[in-house]
């Protein structure tokens, strides 16, 4: 079955989101939102599918959210064209390979605009040397067919990486090419086109910045590195080791010399800034030397916790990207006591769903 997207209703669903966002934000008196559209199809750069076995056949499936019925997928127009191409070739390549298809229950795909793809095969069985040899042959066959592919095998407490567990993305952002290492099983922005819109919007509205930037939850440095051009220095925190390593690589790959990444949670950083705790990880970093006039936050769906919210309020400017406008509005009840919204944007990161991504820039009231 080929799932068709309701592209004819794209404008209507986007209009409804804009209306919903305006209503939610009305109590905070924001300016009119800037609206950034998604491509109509093939916009999602990563996808996960369950694998269904039926006698000698196997295929990708998804489950209908309402009926819970399984849907057989040959193509998936939500995902990038590269993922769609790989879906067909991969299943055809492993269908007759017993070692590769036996107890395979899920396939994860991560693709880039730079035409690279990482495929993770997940199993309910132990993986050994026999699997590795078959997987190496599969990878070479896929590369022979023109795919720039990395292949990973996963099972309980097992991860087999044939070459690398990452691929490098190259995004055109505000007139320059930005290199971003993307690590398997780590967070990356799913909609590359909308991610570019978010980065360029953030660059544009912080062009007049003074002093330094602090970013909490920086991931692989997606925003930190793009925004570095607008600030004297950038200090960024991240808790996940693979993301920190990717961010350090990205700093070097992009020739950026004013970004410092530290591995700690937002809560730990708050304690360090308040002098409540000392951390060995901060040796050689003088937090007091940073003059952070702007703080950037892109928190999880739960929003900012109370302690971090209090810390964030101390900064003259707050750039807040939210994947959940409800928790954003809850946080704004506190933040708008001391700040006003100077910019608002809606990013249609997840078209044809109720999910909205939005951004606000808040500036301290005089």
Swiss-Prot record:
EC numbers for this chain: 2.1.1.-, 2.1.1.35
UniProt source species: Photorhabdus laumondii subsp. laumondii (strain DSM 15139 / CIP 105565 / TT01) (Photorhabdus luminescens subsp. laumondii)
Any Gene Ontology biological process: tRNA methylation
Statement: the UniProt record of this protein carries the keyword Plastid: no
HAMAP family recorded: RNA_methyltr_TrmA
GO molecular function: rRNA binding; tRNA (uracil(54)-C5)-methyltransferase activity, S-adenosyl methionine-dependent; tRNA binding
UniProt keyword list: Methyltransferase, S-adenosyl-L-methionine, Transferase, tRNA processing
Binding site for S-adenosyl-L-methionine: 189, 217, 222, 238, 298
Protein family per UniProt: Belongs to the class I-like SAM-binding methyltransferase superfamily. RNA M5U methyltransferase family. TrmA subfamily.
Gene Ontology, cellular component aspect: cytosol
Protein function: Dual-specificity methyltransferase that catalyzes the formation of 5-methyluridine at position 54 (m5U54) in all tRNAs, and that of position 341 (m5U341) in tmRNA (transfer-mRNA).
Matches recorded under Pfam families: tRNA_U5-meth_tr
Gene3D superfamilies linked: 2.40.50.1070, Vaccinia Virus protein VP39
Name this polypeptide is given: tRNA/tmRNA (uracil-C(5))-methyltransferase
Active site (catalytic residues): 323 (nucleophile), 357 (proton acceptor)
Reaction(s) catalysed (UniProt annotation): uridine(54) in tRNA + S-adenosyl-L-methionine = 5-methyluridine(54) in tRNA + S-adenosyl-L-homocysteine + H(+); uridine(341) in tmRNA + S-adenosyl-L-methionine = 5-methyluridine(341) in tmRNA + S-adenosyl-L-homocysteine + H(+)
């Amino acid at each position: 079955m080929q799932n068709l997207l309701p592209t004819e209703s794209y404008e209507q669903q986007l209009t409804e989101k804009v209306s919903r966002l305006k209503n939610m934000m009305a109590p905070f008196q924001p300016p009119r939102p800037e609206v950034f559209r998604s491509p109509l199809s093939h916009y999602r750069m990563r996808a996960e599918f369950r694998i269904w076995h039926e006698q000698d056949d196997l295929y990708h499936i998804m489950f209908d959210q309402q009926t819970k019925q399984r849907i057989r997928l040959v193509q998936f127009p939500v995902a990038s064209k590269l993922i769609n191409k790989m879906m067909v070739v991969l299943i055809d390549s492993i269908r007759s390979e017993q070692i590769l298809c036996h107890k395979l229950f899920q396939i994860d795909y991560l693709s880039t605009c730079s035409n690279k793809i990482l495929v993770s095969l997940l199993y309910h069985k132990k993986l050994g040397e026999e699997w590795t040899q078959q997987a190496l042959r599969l990878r070479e066959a896929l590369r022979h067919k023109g795919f720039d592919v990395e292949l990973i095998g996963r099972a309980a407490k097992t991860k087999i990486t044939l070459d690398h567990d990452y691929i490098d993305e190259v995004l055109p952002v505000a007139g320059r090419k930005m290199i971003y290492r993307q690590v398997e099983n780590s967070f990356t922005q799913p909609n590359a086109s909308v991610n570019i819109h978010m980065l360029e919007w953030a660059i544009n509205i912080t062009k007049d910045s003074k002093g330094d930037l602090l970013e909490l939850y920086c991931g692989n440095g997606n925003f930190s590195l793009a925004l570095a051009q607008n600030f004297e220095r950038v200090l960024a925190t991240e808790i996940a080791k693979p993301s920190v390593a990717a961010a350090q690589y990205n700093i070097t790959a992009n020739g950026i010399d004013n970004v410092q990444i530290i591995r700690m949670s937002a809560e730990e950083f708050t304690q360090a800034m308040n002098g409540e705790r000392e951390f060995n990880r901060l040796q050689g970093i003088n937090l007091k030397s940073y003059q952070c006039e702007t703080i950037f936050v892109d928190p999880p769906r739960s929003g900012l916790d109370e302690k971090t919210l209090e810390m964030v309020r101390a900064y003259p400017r707050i750039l807040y990207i939210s994947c959940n406008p409800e928790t954003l509005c809850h946080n704004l009840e506190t933040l708008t006591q001391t700040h006003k919204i100077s910019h608002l944007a809606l990013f249609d990161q997840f078209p044809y769903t109720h999910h909205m991504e939005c951004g606000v820039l808040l500036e301290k009231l005089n």
